[in-house]
A protein has these predicted regions:
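N-terminal non-catalytic cap/leader segment that marks the start of a structured domain
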Residues: 1-101
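Glycine-enriched loop-and-adjacent helix/strand subsegments that border the catalytic/binding cleft
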Residues: 76-192
Length: 192
């Protein structure tokens, strides 16, 4: 199942991507007189129960939308990232491969929808992007064993990690400011 979000009355609404188009989950659920999550946060919170409410809505759906896409996930507690997570990229950046993962964060203002234009600032000239696999957590996790880790993942989507390298390296290699501008974390188009 491919879950998406789209803008409805300036708020994100949940959709199902099907070969026929994007099903408006709330409109389709209302047409059928059934309950369904209103947005991605509700779907994630409901876990398997939410997925079982959503699956039948794709069959014989009549309520489709052409609304613009929203970021697949909009209500995030944290956006945790791992820097220099593969050898070739570390080499491209001229940096040594770290002995342990290098964590950094992005803020929710950095989220953007798949295909959304990202506004670049004229003060910076060295923009960079990295394609990423985004794991969306389905429930809180702390001190989880390696064997259990994937039990906490709700789904996956694609993402881009945008950076202004001139800002990043001008300030001693910090990562936060250069990676958290509005729209610097486009994700989507769907969550699987």
């Amino acid at each position: 199942m491919k879950l998406v979000q789209f803008w409805h009355d300036s708020a994100p609404a949940l959709g199902l991507q099907t070969p026929q188009g994007i099903v408006d989950v709330q409109a389709e659920a209302a047409r059928r007189g059934v309950s369904a999550p209103a947005d991605m946060a509700q779907a994630i919170a409901l876990g398997d129960e939410g997925l079982s409410q959503l699956a039948p809505l794709a069959e014989g759906a009549r309520c489709f939308t052409q609304a613009p896409p929203a970021p697949v996930v909009t209500q995030t507690g944290r956006i945790l990232c791992i820097g220099l997570n593969y050898r070739r990229h570390a080499k491209e950046c001229g940096l040594p491969l770290p002995p342990a993962p290098v964590p950094f964060c992005k803020f929710s203002n950095a989220l953007a929808a798949h295909g959304e234009a990202v506004k670049l600032m004229p003060d910076y000239k060295e923009y960079d992007y990295e394609a990423e696999l985004v794991a969306v957590m389905g429930r809180p996790a702390r001190d989880v064993s390696v064997d259990e880790a994937l039990d906490y993942v709700y789904g996956y989507t694609c993402g881009d990690d945008l950076s202004t390298r001139d800002l990043q390296f001008a300030r001693g290699g910090q990562w936060l400011l250069s990676k958290t501008f509005d729209g610097f974390a486009p994700i989507g188009p769907c969550l699987v």
